Amino acid sequence: MKQILLLLTAFFISCTVSVPHNAPVTTIAKGVDILQQDYEISKGGERLPTKLFIFDVTLSNRISLKATTADDSNTAICSSHERNTAIAPISKQLEMMQRNNKQIKVLGGVNSDFFHIKSSNMICGVMYRNGECLKGSYDDQSTIFALLKNGTAVCVTSAEYEAMDKSLILEAVSGRQMLVNDNVAQSSESKTFHPRTAVGVTKDGKRVFILVADGRRKGYSNGLSYADMVTIFKKLGAYDALNLDGGGSSCFSINTGRGQFAPLNRPSDKSGERAVPNGIAVIYRR
């Protein structure tokens, strides 16, 4: 984990669009670090702050990832608009997962899928839990983050997903824009800055970086552009990375003890944590 801090430090020193203020690293389990970073971004000629939160996860027999749902059940996810998909804040989803699974310790997690927030709350992409496909359809822009049964993780395009052996998938959630694909930075015409949630993996699939950036609070944090995320994931060492649901959905929640969870970041909605359909949990197998 020290290597990643050195990489980040070198990046922040050399970067022309971001200036570091601190880079605290907290180890919450062997193989799981939380990195926090203060940035300054250049936006419209102004230098503005942005705060980052990153889970640096080395997958192993003990450390893994699980897809979350509103009530920790597969039936919470609906594959059509015929009924509403259940939603809950990520912290509540993690609490429910912890309550129902005493054989694991839930360390924290983030939101994941884009969803139909103005109608049925149906997620826009595919989702798997415990090897079961809960939703197999996806929209044209979908990308997929998956944990495979061999313990490695992948970020893939929809075309790459179609070519996969689906029986190998253990957990999966979906995003949209690919940020890095086969070690190649992906360009975007969008120059807007928003709160962000994103995930990246190393080439061997054994290391996962889960990023949340706060935004929409000028005096506190102003978000990231796609180009910023590309640069960050490349410097982290991601071979593939993709963008998850951001904006008011972006939440980086951690275990605060006694089965309780709370955001380490500051979600941008005035009401606090937004209720969402699903997320990614970082877990320790006891």
What are these regions (language model features)?
Residues 107-111, 144-146, 154-155, 200, ...:
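Structural recognition of the beta-strand scaffold that forms the well-ordered cores
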Residues 16-138, 143:
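Zymogen propeptides
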Residues 119-138, 188-203, 207-240, 249-286:
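Conserved, well-ordered active-site substructure
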Residues 4-13:
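Sec-dependent N-terminal signal peptides
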Residues 69-76, 159-164, 212-218:
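Short, solvent-exposed aromatic-acidic interface loops
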Residues 110-191:
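Active-site-adjacent helix-turn-beta-strand microarchitecture at beta-sheet edges
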Residues 59-63, 151-152, 200-209:
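Beta-strand-turn-beta hairpins that frame and shape the catalytic cleft
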Residues 40-43, 48-56, 174-205:
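Conserved beta-alpha junction segments in alpha/beta enzyme cores
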